[in-house]
Each structure stands twice: as C-alpha cells, then as structure tokens.
C-alpha cells in the first residue's frame, strides 16, 4: 500500500509538471502576443522562468519556503519537546531526521517541505506547541513526517514553484496592461484587423486572467487527497487514532494565521491557514476537518 502510494506520487509529479508547464506556456504565449508581438517568444521566456523556479525550489526548497513563511530553525536545545517528537516520528517512519522550524504565530498549524526525505524539514507554529499535548503533537508531526515519507513534499514543492511563476507572470502582464502597454499597441493593430486578431486578443486576455486560477485548482485537487492519506499514515505511525482525532478537533477550532500566507504556500499546511467563508470555501486547500475526523473514526 505504502510503496504503491509512493510510486503513484512519483507518477503524479510528472503529470503535475506537465499540467503546470502547459499553463505556464499558455500564459507566456499570451504575454508575448500582447506585449512583444511574438507569442512563441513569450512562451520560451515563460518556460525558462518556470524551469528556473522549479529547479531553485527543488534544490533550495527548505530555505525558500521557510523564509516565505517566516519560520526560524530550532534544535534539541532550543525546542526539545518538538525536536524529540519529530525525532521519534522520523525513527518510526524510517526516514532521516528532518530539520525543525517554528513559526511565531498563535494559530495552530504545521507543514513539511523539501524535495525528498534526505532534504526535508517540518515547521510548527508556536500556537500549536502551546495548545497541543504530547499525543496530539505526535499525531500532527506524524502527519507531516508521513508527507515526507510518501514523497508528498516533492509534489507540493514543485506546485508552489510553478503556481508562483504563473501568478508572477500574470500579475506582471496585468500591471503592464494597467499602464496601457498592450492596449495602445494592440488597439492600433486590431482597429483595422481581421476577426482572428480580435479572437487572439480575447483568448490572450482570458489566459492571463484564468491561468493562475486554473493552476491553483490543480494544486488544490492534489492537496486535498493527500491530506486523507497523511492522516491515516500518522495513525499508522503513532498507533493512536484518538490522538489524531483530538488534534484535528483542536485544529478545526483554531483561528486563521495572523501572518499573511500566500496562496501557493497554503496547500502545504495541515490546517487551512486562511479559513475564509462563503465563496472562498471553493478554494480551500484542504478537505473539511469534520470529514477527515469521520474517516479516522471508520478505521
């Protein structure tokens, strides 16, 4: 079961790469068509940017993601309780000891990152450490260590990189359009242009607006399914389903994180760090905690 999941996650990594690079190529082509009169040129530039983003995240994911989330590294002397729990979970999971970080935030949350089990790290908020008892902390860290063991972190890391690249390119195009960089240039071309030019203009604008949304939805679909598996894997490590249930119950009652968490990083956390309501529920990075608890009760 476990080895099948690891193999599945490795296959999903390549599928994920393909989908995100297709979206990136679409945005690049649209930006190139609108601003430099060369869709192909924009496509090539976008793919180069995406490749650099993905490569940098693979080799420097821990430093980049921890910096993005304001985490500080700790050790056995500065955070002995957290360090020893992570050490125990890593030993049971038979993976190398990950680096350990703390985020100074009163909300209850945690995440794991890295490109593989040999280059991984976990982070927990100060609020989580203050509220969770030992069994609950073991359950949460077992969840994060499971993400490492199951190679979920590689998928998450690549997703963060490529969603960031797509969002950056779309945002750049939006600012240039705001200042009229493409509007004046293309309006002169299209005033006497044919229907194809107008269609290309509309499609390019839609690509710039919708590609970040599409990339986020792909990331969410992958993230939600992984959370169920990590919950179950944590119970496998701790042999304590009630500890995971109690931890999830406390996470459900936690407030949103006080510090800003960008959309690309939200999917990394065990608990949705934003917790919006209404329309925002469509873009939750995690399945409802009540559903996660119900699945654990059925184990």
Swiss-Prot record:
One of its GO terms (molecular function) is metalloendopeptidase activity. It is found in: Cell membrane. It is a multi-pass membrane protein. Its EC number is 3.4.24.-. InterPro entries: HtpX_protease (IPR050083), Pept_M48_protease_HtpX (IPR022919), Peptidase_M48 (IPR001915). Zn(2+) binds at residues 143, 147, 227. Keywords: Cell membrane, Hydrolase, Membrane, Metal-binding, Metalloprotease, Protease, Transmembrane, Transmembrane helix, Zinc. The active site is at residue 144. Its cofactor is Zn(2+). The keyword Protease applies. Disulfide bonds: none annotated. The keyword Cytoplasm does not apply. The chain crosses the membrane at residues 15-35, 39-59, 158-178, 198-218. Belongs to the peptidase M48B family. This is Protease HtpX homolog.
